[in-house]
Regions:
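Residue-level detector of beta-strand structural context in well-folded domains
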Residues: 9, 48-50, 71-73, 157, ...
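Anionic-ligand binding region
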Residues: 34, 45-50
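Predominantly a Rossmann-like dinucleotide-binding segment in NAD(P)-dependent oxidoreductases
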Residues: 1-41, 163
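A broad structural signal for alpha-helix termini and local helix breaks/kinks
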Residues: 24-25, 54, 133
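NAD(P)-dinucleotide binding in Rossmann-like oxidoreductases
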Residues: 38-45, 54-124, 142
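C-terminal helix-rich "cap/oligomerization" subdomain common to oxidoreductases
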Residues: 128-168
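Conserved loop-to-helix N-cap of the C-terminal "lid" that shapes the substrate pocket in Rossmann-like
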Residues: 10-14, 119, 140-146
């Protein structure tokens, strides 16, 4: 994939990290800082890390197209933590799991595990969009959400290029 055609870690994977962070905080970040390593052959970002500074805290993520596959979301708070296993492209052959730890025990005793039924989430998204179009209803996620996510993505690219925080 050539950079002139799009693609790369941030567009293809990091978009989900940004969306999950925006959803968790219920807001756009105030500012972002990013660091990008580009593939010398294709020019796309193959490794991207960013800090998103929200009014209520920070989100940090790393995404890559060329590292060993690993996918988790961790929410860390003052009273506990949540970990979601393979949240963005859930496997079809086993459930995605969420781990809730409200004990604060560093060894993880008392973690509650919840398994979600297997599903083809991309088909479900397409079906929901089709129903909204065919039946004249609202789409599950409005266009404004995609525009907001893209603003954050572009800010991460700008930050990496300039080597400084970018305010949204």
């Amino acid at each position: 994939m050539l950079s002139s055609r799009g693609g790369g870690a941030l567009y293809d994977i990091g978009c989900y990290c940004i969306h999950a962070s925006r959803y968790a905080f219920g807001a756009l970040p105030k500012r972002v800082v990013g660091l990008i390593e580009r593939d010398p052959k294709f020019g796309t970002d193959r490794l991207t890390s960013a800090i998103l500074d929200f009014p209520g805290g920070q989100a940090i993520f790393t995404c890559s197209t060329q590292l060993v596959p690993y996918q988790r979301v961790h929410f860390l708070g003052t009273k506990g933590r949540i970990e979601i296993e393979i949240p963005f492209n859930a496997p079809r052959d086993r459930p995605t799991r969420m781990f809730l730890d409200e004990t604060g025990d560093i060894f993880g005793s008392g973690i509650v595990t919840e398994a979600f039924d297997t599903a083809d989430q991309y088909t479900m998204q397409g079906d929901a969009f089709s129903r909204a179009v065919l039946e004249g209803g609202e789409v599950p996620v409005p266009l404004e959400d995609a525009i907001a996510n893209m603003a954050v993505i572009e800010a991460v690219f700008q930050s990496a290029a300039r080597g400084e925080w970018v305010t949204l």
